[in-house]
Amino acid sequence: MVKKIGLITSGGDSPGMNACIRAVVRTARAEHIDVVGFYRGYEGLIDDDHIHLTKSKVSNIIHRGGTILKTARSKRFMTPEGIQMAVNTLQKHQLDGFVIIGGDGSFRGAQELTKHTDIKTVGCPGTIDNDLVGTDFTIGYDTAINTVVEAVDKIRDTAESHDRIFVVEVMGRDAGLIALRSAIACGAEAILIPERKNDLRTLLDRKKTWRQTKKSRIIIVAEGDENGGAVGIGNLLKLEWPEFDIRISILGHIQRGGNPTCMERVNASLM
């Protein structure tokens, strides 16, 4: 019988993590299960930096971005000593289960943890990259793409006013799903993602066509693109297309913040 579980948020933060924390705690408490939260992911597990989570401690957080448990990437956890310290913490608190909210790296950590303990472990997919199997949408993805769409719509306004081409970089080191979906929603004229190689040549071949039609364009690039992201591509286009006014915009960490969307809150609550 499960009496007590542990909970962490790990890796890069994503909007909706707080909604998921709330759902875990409220569901557990409804079954009279205690929840111990550890701060800063696996780092907090190693250091036993914990808090006893109650329904009152997770009230009014469903709408907030970030994570009340903080998050981090832990190099110590990848060492035998670090893993043993984490296992010792789990045993000290007599946990019957352990919940990890995070991305692929966090799940690999959970997999490693299960090799050293028989505690039942559950992973909730929390990453803006949407690159985990088993779910159509990870926690954070919907909010991130909505943030991108809002930003690119504004960039489109100024691009149109000045007849400029904007190369916009979005997050996605190994996965181009943020770039792909937001490009469709924004009506971007071109997209470059890690999953498709050699698309830059196709883009360069559009020079004649683009010169004869409208002058303002949006090119969305995933940061993991093989050509060096927006900076690499933008600088190359400036050399290849000197007649165009080309600007570079990197959206950065705004994609990981902000209030989660309605869809995000519902998905995170149901997971």
Could you tell me what each predicted segment is?
Residues 22-31, 51-57, 112-122, 139-143, ...:
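A glycine- and small-aliphatic-rich helix-loop capping segment at beta-alpha/alpha-beta transitions
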Residues 45-100, 105-106, 139-150:
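Glycine-rich oxoanion-binding loops at beta->alpha junctions
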Residues 10-13, 38-44, 73-74, 103-105, ...:
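Short, ordered loop/turn segments at secondary-structure junctions
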Residues 13-24, 46, 80-81, 98-111, ...:
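Short glycine/serine/threonine-rich phosphate/pyrophosphate-binding segments
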